[in-house]
């Protein structure tokens, strides 16, 4: 198995480390902060209504909207991680010096990761704990507005449209959460040998192949393909549904455009190239919409077999032929 035991994490330490650098928070007085939180909540509700009408889904998005700072985001991550680990039903490691060391090392790594991610993350829809909650990371949103000169009303609605679209994807396809969970379990339950992993790495050039191969590798590839579609679909909806409401939507998309070519982790592991997921998923959705209109995209949420494969993400016409005939 990729994981034989539930990960040991000292969450108190992890969250303390993730909170380091609170002085980096945008300088807002109490009154401005209160207005910001209220505005983001109202904007998120409006975004849910706009996206729901655009996608023809009888819902206004996530049940709960939480506006958080970086500390609040760390707490949310803990809840999501613990829920996923519980659902994997992995046993706990025996207590002892080795587990103590592992617990603290994991806390340092996770705390640093949460801290780095929270400074970039604008929002997140939690589809996996059953809480049906949309998080908006207020300090990161404000920092982007100031750094790039974005119009706050436009940028906040655009971000909220993307995240509410994720909520509506799971409304349109109630089976999607279980489908993703099953693929994740197949990956974590992999029994591939190191030799199989090295052979797969040599064949694919993807470092992720060292961790999983065979059927689990196929599950990971399939999962990455679907996540690519979901991110692209959320970007497409934010752009097109937002166009009548966001005067600067074209400028926002240009500012967030991902250039071709892998960068960072993507150079050694295409499976974890998040920038490629946004870029390729958006290109797929644009082409399908050009060929079949918005109803053509909705077909992906009818049943699991309609979800695009990784190969189809790169060849939207192939997906249209398979699903629409």
Give the positions of each predicted feature.
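Short pre-active-site segment immediately N-terminal to the catalytic Zn-binding motif
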Residues: 140-159
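Auxiliary, metal-adjacent structural segments of Zn-dependent hydrolase domains
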Residues: 43-140
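Catalytic Zn2+-binding segment of zinc metalloproteases
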Residues: 163-180
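Acidic/histidine-rich catalytic neighborhood
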Residues: 178-226, 230
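Short, solvent-exposed segments of well-ordered alpha helices
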Residues: 34, 38, 151, 155, ...
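Pan-zinc metallopeptidase signature
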Residues: 222-325
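Short alpha-helical functional segments enriched in proximate histidine and acidic residues
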Residues: 50, 167-171, 237
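N-terminal low-structure segments adjacent to metalloprotease catalytic domains
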Residues: 1-79, 153, 295-325
């Amino acid at each position: 198995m990729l994981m034989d035991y539930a990960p040991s994490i000292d969450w108190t330490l992890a969250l303390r480390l993730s909170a380091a650098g609170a002085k980096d928070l945008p300088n807002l007085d109490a009154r401005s902060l209160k207005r910001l939180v209220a505005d983001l909540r109202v904007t998120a509700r409006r975004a849910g209504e706009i996206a729901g009408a655009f996608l023809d889904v009888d819902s206004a998005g996530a049940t709960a909207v939480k506006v958080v700072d970086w500390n609040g985001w760390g707490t949310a991550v803990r809840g999501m991680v613990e829920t996923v680990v519980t659902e994997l039903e992995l046993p706990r490691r025996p207590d002892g010096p080795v587990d103590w060391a592992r617990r603290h090392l994991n806390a340092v790594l996770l705390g640093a990761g949460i801290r780095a991610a929270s400074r970039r993350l604008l929002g997140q829809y939690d589809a996996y704990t059953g809480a049906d909650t949309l998080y908006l990371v207020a300090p990161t949103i404000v920092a982007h507005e100031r750094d790039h000169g974005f119009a706050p009303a436009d940028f906040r609605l655009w971000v909220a449209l993307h995240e509410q679209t994720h909520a509506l994807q799971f409304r349109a396809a109630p089976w999607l959460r279980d489908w993703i969970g099953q693929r994740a379990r197949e990956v974590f339950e992999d029994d591939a040998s190191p030799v199989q992993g090295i052979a797969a790495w040599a064949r694919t050039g993807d470092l992720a192949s060292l961790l999983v191969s065979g059927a689990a590798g196929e599950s990971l590839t399939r999962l990455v393909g679907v996540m690519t579609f979901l991110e692209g679909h959320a970007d497409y909806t934010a752009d097109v549904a937002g166009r009548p409401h966001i005067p600067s939507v074209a400028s926002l998309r240009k500012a967030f455009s991902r250039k071709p070519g892998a960068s960072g982790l993507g150079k050694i592991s295409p499976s974890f190239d998040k920038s490629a997921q946004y870029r390729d998923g958006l290109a797929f959705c644009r082409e399908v919409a050009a060929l079949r209109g918005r109803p053509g995209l909705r077909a992906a949420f009818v049943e699991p077999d309609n979800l695009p494969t990784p190969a189809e993400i790169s060849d939207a016409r192939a997906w249209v032929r398979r699903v629409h005939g």
